[in-house]
Design a protein with these regions (language model features):
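N-proximal low-complexity "stem/linker" segments adjacent to membrane-targeting elements
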Residues: 1-27
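Cell-envelope/extracellular polymer assembly enzymes that use nucleotide-activated donors
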Residues: 4-7, 35, 181
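Acidic helix N-cap motif at the loop->helix transition within catalytic regions
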Residues: 17-20, 45-53, 93, 97
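A conserved acidic beta->alpha catalytic loop
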Residues: 25, 32, 40-49, 89
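Glycine-rich, basic loop-to-helix element that forms the pyrophosphate-binding segment
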Residues: 64-80
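Short aromatic/hydrophobic "clamp" motif used to bind/position activated sugar donors
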Residues: 85
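Conserved donor NDP-sugar-binding/catalytic core segment of glycosyltransferases
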Residues: 97-130
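Conserved nucleotide-sugar donor-binding catalytic segment
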Residues: 136-223
Length: 285
């Protein structure tokens, strides 16, 4: 059997009430050129029972204690066979048409090593979209490179498995910014990206999510301090620290390609709508 185009790794711990929707968001895609891998960290809720309901759709899965989210993703990537890889949090969803859009973008730009798309945040309570992030339509190679401009949004990034094998695993010492560190590593190594003009990722906002920790003021300050320390660590480790010049060049490109105006329009038009009003979601949430 030929290797799939994409390997999707879901990391889960005690999200039995949500992982079913996450899995369904993958298996309901309009492109089946993928494999699904699930790494459960030894959940104590009904997660395993839910995962077993979808075993026929899963290439490989395991439930055992791990060392955290990054460790779980690395474990999943070690079993991946796809040409490209990505991750998905067990409480989020892959939005409709994502795999097709990513495949089209990467096929049109075979020299690219990774693709990045856009995302929305939605409230778990009533599925209202609370934020819509739309990046640049086009990112020319001259704007990319060491210390230049980068636009990457978490699990909206899909990169070559060969790049992962070359750069090594995700840094498991980071709690909040492990994705930022990895994208910095890719850029500093000279790998180029192609933009996907599509909403790829639905980020579910709920009280148990990692970003929900930004609620209480004291807790927010502590988390900000942790994130600032992690960003300083990333700069020292990777050397990635874009100058103001390249940031302004990136903003200028966004004005020229129209994506800055699209982002403003989308934030006005989409935010406040129900997720199911804007996207053709055929599965449970």
């Amino acid at each position: 059997m030929a290797n799939p185009f994409l390997s999707i790794i879901i990391a889960n711990y005690n999200y039995g009430s949500m992982i079913g929707a996450t899995i369904e968001s993958v298996i309901n895609q309009d492109c089946d050129d993928y494999e699904l891998i699930i790494v459960d960290g030894g959940s104590k809720d009904n997660s395993v029972e839910v995962i077993k309901q979808y075993e026929k759709n899963i290439a490989w899965w395991v439930s055992e204690p791990d060392k955290g989210q990054s460790n779980a993703f690395n474990k999943g990537f070690s079993h991946a066979r796809g040409e490209f890889i990505t991750w998905l949090n067990a409480d989020d969803i892959l939005l409709p048409g994502t795999i097709s859009a990513v495949k089209a973008a990467l096929t049109s730009k075979p020299s690219a090593d990774y693709a990045t798309g856009n995302f929305v945040r939605f409230l778990n309570s009533d599925y209202t979209i609370s934020e819509a992030k739309w990046g640049p339509h086009y990112l020319p190679y001259w704007l990319q490179g060491k210390g230049r401009y980068s636009v990457t949004f978490g699990p909206t990034t899909f990169w070559r498995r060969s790049v992962y094998e070359k750069l090594g695993p995700i840094d498991e010492s980071l709690h909040y910014t492990m994705d930022t560190e990895y994208w910095a590593r890719m850029m500093m190594a000279g790998h180029k990206q192609v933009r996907v003009n599509h909403y790829c990722w639905g980020f579910r906002m709920h009280e148990d999510s990692k970003t929900a920790e930004f609620g209480a003021h004291e807790r927010s300050l502590k988390i900000k301090q942790t994130m600032d320390a992690e960003h300083d660590y990333i700069k020292k480790k990777t050397g990635y620290n874009p100058t103001a010049f390249w940031r302004y060049m990136g903003l200028a490109m966004r004005v020229l390609d129209g994506s800055a105006f699209r982002a403003i329009y989308n934030s006005k038009y989409i935010v406040g709508k129900k997720l199911t009003e804007y996207f053709e979601i055929k599965h449970k949430l």
